[in-house]
Structures are given as C-alpha cells and as structure tokens.
C-alpha cells in the first residue's frame, strides 16, 4: 500500500532550446498534476474510498553547464541574475507557471542565452500537497466530516513544513553527493506555502501584488494611499489600471471593463492581520502597501512570504 500510489500517466523529460517551449511544457505538466489531484479530491469528498495513496508531483527544470563563464557576446552579461556561477547540474521545482509565467520565461531565456545547451523539463519527485492544488475560491474541506478530514492524510500528501525551510535563500543548503545544485532560492512547495499565507495575512490574492512594495505600521499612511488609489481610478488618463483592497475588492480605472473575478471580491467582516492594498499598473509595475501593524514578527513573516514573488 505505502509503496504504491495513483499518479498521472508518466511523462518523460523533454529538452528545450527556447524559453517559450520550456514554459509551455512546465504549464502542461503542472496542469496535469492539478487536474489529477482535483479529480481525486472531488471523488474523495463525495465518499469514494481509495486503497492506494493519490499523488501528483511538481514539474522541474534542469540545466547542465560545462563552464561557469557566460557565453561570449551575451546581451544579458551585464545582469546580476539569469546564470549559474560554476559548472554542474542545477535544478529546481516549479509551481503556478500561470502566475509566474513572465518571470519563468525571462529566467529560462537568460539561462539559455548565458550558457547555451538545453533546458530539461520533467516531473520531479516532490509531491504537491493536495491543499496547494485547490483553486483559490474552493473550500472543499468544509464539506467533509471530521473523520473524513482525518482520513485525508492517509490518501493525499499534506503540507510538510520540514520541506519548506529557507536553507537555499540563507546560503546554508549543501547538496548531498550526487544531488543537483539549486537553481532557485525557493522550492515549489515553499512558494506554494507562501502564496497561501499571503492570502491569509493580506486578505488579497498573490496575483495582485506589485513589484514595488511599501510597508507601514501607521494607519494614516494607509488611509492616504487608499484615497490616492480611488482618486487615480477616477482619472481616465492614469497609468494605474485598478485599485485592490482586502477581500479582493477591485475598483477599475474609469472606462475600463470589469474582469471575471471582480464579482468575487467582498469586503471582509474584519480586516486581516496585515491588510494589503494594491495600486495596479501594467506588468506588475504598480505599488503595493502593506500595514504590518506592530511587532517585528509581523515584518519578518510578511517579507518571508512576499519574497517568493520576487518583486
């Protein structure tokens, strides 16, 4: 029983010489894994019993480099990222390739520009915790009895905090003999955990966070930011496209149509622990302001989680 599990059909690793095809394969593998877990979860909630574990896994990207030096004539040689420092095998797991599409595409492109060769994309051995497969507005566990919820751990992988430390980002991670070097500061599971915590702490979806983030513990700064945000939405010539408040309450700039998920926004009965407000501009170039309240623990918590967005 423990050695067997119900998984998506095996997909062999593929090699890519351009960023777009690598990203498309990552997206396809990730979606296959999500579909597998979501379908099994629907069956589990409706009463189906499984005699094996149900598992699906994060996609990975891997690169083998023969030298650490950048390719001669690379347009990206002046950047401080997008390359590896020494020869070897580098690998990382990936998640939410929809949310991170532009980021992943740029990183893939730079790796190929800087080192040549191919990117290898495949299915990793890192299981996706079933909670991280739910769509944002799914509230599946609420439909189950306590006994059924307890049984979940026998069937599905649950979040494992031991697999989510910050050893890579802190520079303390040492790969074992035969293991690849890390290709990213954060593993997919660590990123998924932070994306979930961002929703909880800020009251807004991770997709709304902008690349310029301000932190404050003074409410009057937030009040002024909210005033400026609504003011910008009344200006048809503003470069800002939307203003997002806790509960994913979206105000679009005058003249712009509402989008599908806008209707799901709802003012929460009470503000979350660290409310987030987002003045949205094209390509995430707007401003996010977070009220971190009091205490250094809040500041460390929220920055640890926003870090996975690579603002």
Describe every region a protein language model picked out:
Residues 1-311:
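Accessory terminal and edge-of-domain segments that mediate assembly/interaction
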């Amino acid at each position: 029983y423990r050695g067997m599990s119900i998984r998506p059909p095996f997909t062999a690793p593929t090699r890519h010489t351009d960023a777009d095809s690598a990203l498309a394969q990552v997206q396809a593998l990730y979606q296959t894994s999500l579909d597998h877990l979501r379908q099994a979860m629907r069956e589990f909630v409706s009463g189906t019993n499984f005699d094996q574990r149900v598992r699906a896994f994060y996609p990975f990207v891997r690169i083998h480099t023969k030298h650490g030096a950048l390719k001669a004539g690379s347009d990206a040689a002046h950047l401080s990222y997008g390359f590896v420092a020494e020869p070897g095998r580098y690998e990382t797991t990936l998640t939410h390739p929809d949310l991170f599409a532009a980021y992943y595409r740029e990183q893939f492109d730079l790796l190929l520009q800087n080192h040549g060769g191919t990117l290898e994309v495949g299915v990793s051995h890192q299981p996706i915790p079933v909670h991280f497969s739910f769509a944002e507005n799914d509230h599946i566990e609420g439909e189950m009895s306590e006994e059924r919820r307890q049984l979940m751990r026998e069937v599905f992988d649950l979040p494992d905090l031991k697999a989510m430390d910050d050893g890579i980002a802190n520079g303390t991670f040492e790969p074992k003999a035969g293991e690849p070097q890390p290709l990213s500061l954060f593993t997919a599971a660590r990123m998924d955990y932070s994306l979930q915590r961002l929703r909880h702490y800020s009251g807004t979806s991770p997709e709304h966070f902008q690349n310029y983030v301000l932190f404050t513990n003074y409410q009057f700064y937030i009040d002024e930011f909210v005033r400026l945000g609504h003011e910008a939405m009344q200006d048809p010539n503003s470069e800002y496209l939307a203003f997002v408040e806790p509960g994913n309450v979206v105000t679009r700039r005058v003249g712009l149509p509402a989008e599908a998920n806008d209707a799901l926004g709802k003012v929460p009965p009470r503000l979350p622990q660290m409310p987030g407000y987002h003045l949205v501009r094209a390509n995430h170039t707007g401003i996010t302001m977070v009220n971190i309240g009091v205490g250094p623990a809040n500041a460390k918590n929220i920055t640890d989680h926003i870090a996975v967005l690579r603002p």
